[in-house]
Amino acid sequence: MNRQQELRSAAVYALIVIATCIAFGAIVVGIHEHIHSTTAYLMDHMASPFAIERGNLVTLDGWDEGVSYSALFPAGKGTDAAIIAVMPLIMHTAFVIGGLYVLLSGIISRKKWLFHLTFWLVVVNLMELFAYMPGRAFSRHGDIGNINHGLGLSPWLLLLLTTPPWSCSRCITCTGGCCPG
């Protein structure tokens, strides 16, 4: 293969990666919101698990699970609200752990496209987890805010328990030129 063919092949694969991430992003957000609504439905806090607000499939803006958290807290159902809020995060964690197991086990190592799909499914779910923690530990609304409020947790506790140690290790050890001076 000559240089021009290699560049063309790389460009095509880059477009496939972008399309895969956009598609998985939309699918994962849809599943995320449905897990909220299904959990609320199973706990008898929602009339239908399909009553979610669907948003934009590309920008992922406007999606909402339709759970009335504002009615749960005054009714003394904070723990229920926290359970409803945390369930999609458990799903993202399960997808990451399961996907990593499949990728590292070698089960699909010779199946290029299945490996590709599994890898990017893991990446998209990991991005969702990082978007929630540590980024939203101090949020007063949304999933993390509902978990903190519902369980009466300090955001500092959630931040410390859910921030992966390796994300801080570079600056803690001052390797790689990250320290001033």
Go through each PLM region and give its residues.
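Short, Lys/Arg-rich, polar N-terminal cytosolic tail immediately upstream
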Residues: 1-10
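Short secondary-structure boundary micro-motifs
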Residues: 11-13, 67-68
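Select transmembrane alpha-helical segments in multipass membrane proteins
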Residues: 14-19
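Small-residue-rich helix-interface/hinge motifs
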Residues: 21-78
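Metalloprotease/metallohydrolase-associated module, dominated by Zn2+-dependent proteases
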Residues: 63-177
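Membrane-helix boundary/juxtamembrane motif in polytopic membrane proteins
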Residues: 179-181
